[in-house]
Amino acid sequence: MTNTRKTHPLIKIINHSFIDLPAPSNISAWWNFGSLLGLCLIIQILTGLFLAMHYTSDTMTAFSSVTHICRDVNYGWLIRYIHANGASMFFICLFLHVGRGLYYGSYTYFETWNIGVILLFAVMATAFMGYVLPWGQMSFWGATVITNLLSAIPYIGTTLVEWIWGGFSVDKATLTRFFAFHFILPFIIAALVMIHLLFLHETGSNNPSGLISDSDKIPFHPYYTIKDVLGVLLLVLTLMILVLFSPDLLGDPDNYTPANPLSTPPHIKPEWYFLFAYAILRSIPNKLGGVLALIFSILILMLFPLLHLSKQRSMMFRPLSQCVFWVLVADLFTLTWIGGQPVEHPFIIIGQLASVLYFTIILLILPTVSMIENKLLKW
């Protein structure tokens, strides 16, 4: 008699994805972030569901409903802070996951990579709309500033912004629709994750060497299930330390002031995970130019498969490319720092230089260095 696990129409899908999946024998801890992102998504959907049971998406009561969750709902404060800091953990895992893909050349799986970039956009959109919901000062002004960017689109811009707002300013209609979209998007993300995995399992996982590993595969369970459990424990430990000891460490104090359209906060800035893109946006004086740079700063990831000129897939054996990669990482840290600083000297020029360097490394330096390495190896 054959195993139910291998014959049942539904269970065999799970079996081929998480149990009997042939995986490379040498994938490192950098391959843990996929499962951690799945866990983050589940945590966010569950905590979000419980928050939605008590939240009201009305401008008059939104702020006080969040206060009510924190004060009166059983463990409401815990659910709220797990959700808020869970978003930060989500983005940390996302950035590391994308970084791993760039370093080891995983982007040569076109479909998987492009779905991944779409997922990144979807998660960023969800996080932005979620930040608006508590209806604090930074929620309101963040929504106003970011939605206003669409007015830079020629001809239809102004109409488009008013259409998104549902009026002539960010108001009740905006909050209600943002709540609706914030609720539905994670389920769309979950569906995209399924497609992401579907494409990945067509090719199999990449590995640190970038070489074909068909001759040396091991079953996913128990080897990588136990490895993922370690990652999960570390993620949950980090998240709970953040939630229980300094829940507001990554938040903005301005968001504890109810939204007031008549008083602008001195420094409008998004959550930390958007600061690098915000710095790129601010470094261009032209509105439309800034918006295009902002979009292209993420969309440029889709160009990586086309810009890959090296004869080797991974950067494991390419020391020059490694150096350039880590300069890019340092540049992103610099942009994140600049995004949180006021618009004044010397931050303006640092931001502009870091933005130029970001695009130059990706579009020019990395491909050039790849070609130099090919020449050095007489390939």
Curated annotation (Swiss-Prot):
Keywords: Electron transport, Heme, Iron, Membrane, Metal-binding, Mitochondrion, Mitochondrion inner membrane, Respiratory chain, Transmembrane, Transmembrane helix, Transport, Ubiquinone. The chain crosses the membrane at residues 33-53, 77-98, 113-133, 178-198, 226-246, 288-308, 320-340, 347-367. The keyword Signal does not apply. Heme b b562 binds at residues 83, 182. It is a multi-pass membrane protein. It comes from the Eukaryota. Heme 1 (or BL or b562) is low-potential and absorbs at about 562 nm, and heme 2 (or BH or b566) is high-potential and absorbs at about 566 nm. Belongs to the cytochrome b family. This is Cytochrome b. The gene is MT-CYB.
